[in-house]
């Protein structure tokens, strides 16, 4: 796949620092060395293996793979790709993996009408999870972060309360907001 654009995930930063993931459901494959970072990208198929029937040269795809996308070209198994919907800009398509993860998390957390939800971190995924929580009927969505810009964005996107954990104790604040019940 010829890369169009790639994102830098928090896990990429951890891997770069030498922290490898545990063998869990998310990370089924042990890393192979040399270990190339990157798993958030989108691009165009430039070659296919003889047993591949799902994709052809020229198809635009989003990568949902384990690693190796920090390159102009990368190799992927067919199951680690998803076709880009017709008309979707490739700059947006490259965000397919983190968007899908955040949407899945946000929509499958068991949030119910009237719940209070605390989202720890106002990054890309946290913003999406906060919005999904509101859509699922959460009464109160609280976003905690240390960066004012992320907190301001969360507030503008519908968070009810934002907490800067550099300035306030989030546990004490959540308890105060919920009459000691918590979230």
Indicate residue ranges for each PLM-predicted region.
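Glycine-rich beta-strand-centered segment in the early N-terminal region that forms part
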Residues: 1-7, 21-67, 85
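Cytochrome P450 core scaffold surrounding the K-helix E-X-X-R motif
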Residues: 11-17
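A glycine-rich helix->loop->beta "capping" turn
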Residues: 177-183
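Glycine/charged-rich beta-loop-alpha catalytic/anionic-binding loops adjacent to active sites
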Residues: 26-27, 80-90, 177
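A structural motif shared across PLP-dependent enzymes of the aminotransferase-like
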Residues: 65-78
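Mid-domain Rossmann-like dinucleotide-binding core that forms the NAD(H)/NADP(H) cofactor-binding site
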Residues: 89-168, 172
